[in-house]
Amino acid sequence: NIKSIMVGFLIVMNLFMLGIIAVTTKQQSIVPEEVIDSAISVMKESGFEIGKDIFPKSYVALPSYNTQFYSASDLSELFFGKQVAFRTKDKSLVATEGSAVLTVNNNHFLYGSGSTAVSSGSAYSLVKTLKKKGFDMKGAVYDKEAGYFYRMYNGVNLFNMFIEVSLDSDGEICYMKAQWPKKLVSGERKRISFIESMQKLNPAFPAGGKIKNIELGYSLKSAGGEKFTFTPSWRVQVDDQIRILE
């Protein structure tokens, strides 16, 4: 059956790739064209359509990262030097068409002022303020065209990171929410390839479909208490659905 085919294929490919890894000292190893062709063929048998142009072409060794998030108390101390209760978000704050400022999207800094997006210039000023207040902003990249910032570490996205800020009529911060890591500490390095993650495609997308995007990044896991770990993962879009394969 399809599952057996995929499992058998993965075993063969893993043995093949281990040989390649053994003869290279680089952190990145190129996947041969014939391996990619075979993988795409197996995926088609499992109900997935994928273009060769978006199939990942390499095996990459990435470290995990251990961290803690800024708490509400941390945010209050950073901004005001004392404990201040941020106002509960007004239910009337609704994202308008073309504005993602009040919707938490992957990798974005988010800004809102009522139902109107804060200008890109104002957003940039807010981020400068965050840096002055002590936020770890390493790897933050500003997308001028989109008007938001996203988070990168060693050239790879940290999924589901955001800082959301709303301003009152006087331009003062009246609401703030963040899922943003403090300083990251490198952990165990893990070799990750999309071929090894193929066996998780069917459980994640039982109906199959067209794979539109594959992106390497980090998913978040709780390590107990206030501690968290970012682990290398694939963010896969099949048709209009997005799943993270660890």
Predicted regions and their residues:
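Preferential activation on post-signal-peptide N-terminal prodomains/segments
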Residues: 1-137
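Residue-level detector of short, conserved catalytic/binding motifs and their immediate flanks
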Residues: 9, 163, 234
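Surface-exposed beta-strand edges and their flanking turn/coil or helix-capping segments
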Residues: 33, 162-163, 188-191
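A cross-family detector of function-defining hotspots
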Residues: 71-93, 141-156, 216-225
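Amphipathic N-proximal alpha-helical interface segments
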Residues: 86-113, 147, 151-184, 237-246
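Acidic, serine/threonine- and glycine-rich low-complexity intrinsically disordered segments
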Residues: 119-154, 159, 209-213
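Structured segments of extracytoplasmic/periplasmic soluble domains
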Residues: 129, 133, 165-168, 204
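Extracytoplasmic/luminal low-complexity segments enriched in Pro/Gly and acidic/polar residues
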Residues: 185-246
